[in-house]
């Protein structure tokens, strides 16, 4: 036991009437919604990097957090893990996520970093034996170190490609050893700053080959989890190749991997791409590649990825409605890829941020489930497209332009526009949130 969270009680569900800030008002893990426990719908995860590795810096200033585990030794990394599992237990968090660089100190060589990762994974495994918290997904940090400044899989230097591939292998091994449900790839440096020095064709081909190697290794070692790509349009790169759901799907189709890889979709990244979160979720579901989500929010005035904790349950309800329509999570879940503000220095701030985020998502899920169970929205959606269920409409899809023209002329088809009834549906939505 450490004393970092001393005095902070275990967070329990007390209901909407509670005035206890260290309690859940909406998140009741055992509440059954649409035949499934709330915990199993939401599958919350704590992000190791923002919660325990981020020092509180920004582009204009450095570290503001003074954590007792900050440093580059394995002993401090183990202390960080001990503190992390204490918070997981306080929250009753069912899952966590990590990058390799979050959990182990960087070595002077690849071999040393590999040994450090293996040792800390063993330590985390021991902590997991005494905890209910499991691993939602692992990933490799292929963007922070200067060696990755020109990318990892898309780097012009073959040695960086090799280092990156070896790193991913080790992280996949670690994820499998810890029983992870997924493995994530995020290409923060897989993009370009200027076209003047960029070979787009080569970089795409190398990225495709890299991903194929990941899929091949998954099958070779018998990893039963899902490989996930996380889209983001820019930041840190000027233009990232995994721009949004549609772009990544095109990439997967290009290399024949659309049946092997799904997506981890982040709210903040969707906003940066000029989309709503629910748009990206609905599109991924329609393409069969919805895997998991990173839950956070952006400051809409800032124009960059602020990674704040979710606070707007009507907005989140739109997202969870699309997840329910898609059948819910299988291996995926709700990872809080969110960080407290750099002025929020106290241990209590870290716990309460997660309490608020979990309550916001639970409230959103309940609203979405009420509307989904009511069925009114789906009835209206089906009615709008009912004409396509007729034999004539189905036959037309198997016809030709010439035959369709002949039918239009013969039957004197002259369609009248029909209302989309958007305002009615928005009013319906508001009744449930």
Curated annotation (Swiss-Prot):
Example GO molecular function term?
magnesium ion binding
Q: Keyword Metal-binding: yes or no? A: yes
Entry EC number(s)? 5.3.1.5
Enumerate the residues binding Mg(2+) 2: 266, 269, 305, 307
Output the Gene Ontology cellular-component terms. cytoplasm
According to the record, cofactor stoichiometry and binding are noted as: Binds 2 magnesium ions per subunit.
Going by the entry's taxonomy, the superkingdom of the source organism is recorded as Bacteria
What SUPFAM superfamilies does UniProt report for this protein, alphabetically? Xylose isomerase-like
Q: Does the keyword Isomerase apply?
A: yes
Cofactor dependence is on:
Mg(2+)
Active site annotated at which positions? 99, 102
* Sequence positions that bind Mg(2+) 1: 230, 266, 294, 337
Please name the InterPro entries in this protein's record: Xyl_isomerase-like_sf, Xylose_isom_bac, Xylose_isomerase
Which top-level enzyme class is recorded in the Swiss-Prot or TrEMBL entry? isomerase
Q: What is its main location?
A: cytoplasm
Listed PANTHER family: PTHR48408, XYLOSE ISOMERASE
**Name the UniProt record assigns to this protein:** Xylose isomerase
Organism, as annotated? Cereibacter sphaeroides (strain ATCC 17023 / DSM 158 / JCM 6121 / CCUG 31486 / LMG 2827 / NBRC 12203 / NCIMB 8253 / ATH 2.4.1.) (Rhodobacter sphaeroides)
């Amino acid at each position: 036991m450490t004393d970092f969270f001393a005095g902070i009680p275990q967070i329990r569900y007390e209901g909407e009437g509670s005035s206890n800030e260290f309690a859940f008002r909406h998140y009741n893990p055992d509440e059954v919604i649409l035949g499934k426990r709330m915990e199993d719908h939401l599958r919350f995860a704590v992000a190791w990097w923002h919660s325990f590795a981020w020092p509180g810096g920004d582009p204009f200033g450095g570290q503001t957090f003074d954590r007792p585990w900050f440093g580059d030794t394995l002993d401090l990394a183990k202390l960080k893990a001990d503190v992390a599992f204490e918070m997981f237990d306080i929250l009753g968090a069912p899952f966590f996520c990590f990058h390799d660089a979050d959990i182990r100190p960087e070595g002077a060589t690849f071999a040393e970093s590999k040994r450090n990762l293996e040792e800390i994974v063993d330590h985390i495994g021991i902590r997991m034996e005494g905890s209910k918290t499991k691993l939602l997904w692992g990933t490799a940090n292929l963007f922070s170190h200067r060696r990755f400044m020109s990318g990892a899989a898309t780097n012009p230097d073959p040695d960086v490609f090799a280092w990156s591939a070896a790193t991913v292998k080790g992280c996949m091994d670690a994820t499998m050893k810890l029983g992870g449900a997924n493995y994530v790839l995020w290409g923060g440096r897989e993009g370009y700053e200027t076209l003047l020095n960029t070979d787009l064709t080569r970089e795409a081909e190398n990225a495709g080959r890299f991903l194929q190697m990941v899929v091949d290794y998954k099958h070779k070692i018998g990893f039963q989890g899902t490989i996930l790509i996380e889209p983001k349009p820019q930041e840190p790169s000027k233009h990232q190749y995994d721009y949004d759901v549609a772009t990544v799907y095109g990439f997967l189709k290009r290399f024949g991997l659309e049946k092997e890889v799904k997506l981890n979709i982040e709210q903040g990244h969707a906003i940066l791409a000029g989309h709503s979160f629910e748009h990206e979720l609905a599109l991924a579901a329609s393409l069969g590649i919805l895997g998991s989500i990173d839950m956070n929010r952006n400051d809409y005035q800032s124009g960059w990825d602020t990674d704040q904790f979710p606070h707007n349950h009507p907005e989140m309800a739109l997202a969870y409605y699309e997840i329910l329509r898609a059948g819910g999570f299988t291996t995926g879940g709700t990872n809080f890829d969110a960080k407290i503000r750099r002025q929020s220095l106290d241990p209590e701030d870290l716990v309460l941020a997660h309490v608020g985020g979990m309550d916001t998502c639970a409230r959103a899920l309940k609203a979405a489930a009420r509307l989904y169970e009511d069925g009114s929205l789906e009835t209206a959606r089906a009615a709008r497209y009912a004409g396509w269920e007729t034999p004539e409409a189905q036959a037309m899809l198997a016809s030709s332009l010439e035959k369709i023209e002949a039918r239009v002329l013969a039957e004197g088809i002259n369609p009248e526009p029909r209302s989309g009834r958007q305002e009615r549906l928005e009013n319906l939505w508001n009744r449930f949130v």
